[in-house]
Amino acid sequence: MTMTPLQLGDKIKRFFQPSLPPVGVEIARDFVAAVRLNPKDPTRVERSAITPLPSGLVNPSLSQPNISSPEDLTTVVKSILAKTEIKTGRISLAVPDSSVKVAIHQLDKLPGNENEKQQLLRWRLKKTTPFNVEDAHLSYVSQPGPDGKLNVLTVIIFREVLEQYERLFQGLGIQAGFITSASVAALELLPRTEAGSIPKSTLIVRSSPFSLTAMIIHLGTIVFFRHLDYFEEAQVDGAVPRVLESSGGEIRNLYEEIHPCLMYYQDKLGTAGVDRIWILAPQDLQPEELELLSRQSGAAVSNLNPLQSFRSYPPGSLPVLKSLLAPSLGLAMGSF
């Protein structure tokens, strides 16, 4: 049976732990964010906060240690947990997209035995992963794909990287019961955003000054995932990040980055193009910018508002910082 985006939300929850408290924490390259929802009403945000990080404290990498000073980062995390009055012993955690490898595999079928499934998926990841896949934690979700095949979404993280984040919270007496990439966490908000009008295909673009992640959902199945990290490139040559240039180049460069995604989708599935594009950026695009992207892509383009899923939230900076808080909001929402 083909899944709708609403069913996709239920499927993605296999990545989440429903028994976890409605608390989401994200550790990014340049900030730590935390969100706590009302445990009885997932549409109420009770507390949220973002704390900037000094440069170099968190260095996202697939194969190298991510945290340069666990003691300093622990101090920041402890402070933000106090601000948001998070007192639970278990949380959900989002880590940088650049610290986790997400891939999609088209398979005729998966073995019935869990050990055989793990072996098959690790074997497929072996040639494209810059670390020993046997020294990594692998999660996956199987989705119906085109032509009766399976689309298997895998999320793999090097164990040394994973344990750095786990130890950070263990030192505070907290278990990170579920850990995933920031963009996968934010994806939890999509089914609720599209609840009123479900398109056949959707492109979600999550951008920051130094990175871009693009995901395409076709008939409820994740068929495309692409992450680009420009931080190291900018560090080497001093270049302005390509995704968000100044002097009016922002939208042109954003389209240049998502154009290959659209072409891949059309070529792979033989379709005319995506129906809708959601943009999740630190600042909402202006109406004229959305219109330009719509003309370039041939799709309806809108800012994705993470707060659309919530009926109430504390006054203050949350509406301004909503896009930065999207992964934490998605994690907390995914606990229900």
What do these predicted regions represent?
Residues 1-336:
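Hydrophobic/aromatic-enriched cytosolic interaction surfaces used to assemble or bind macromolecules
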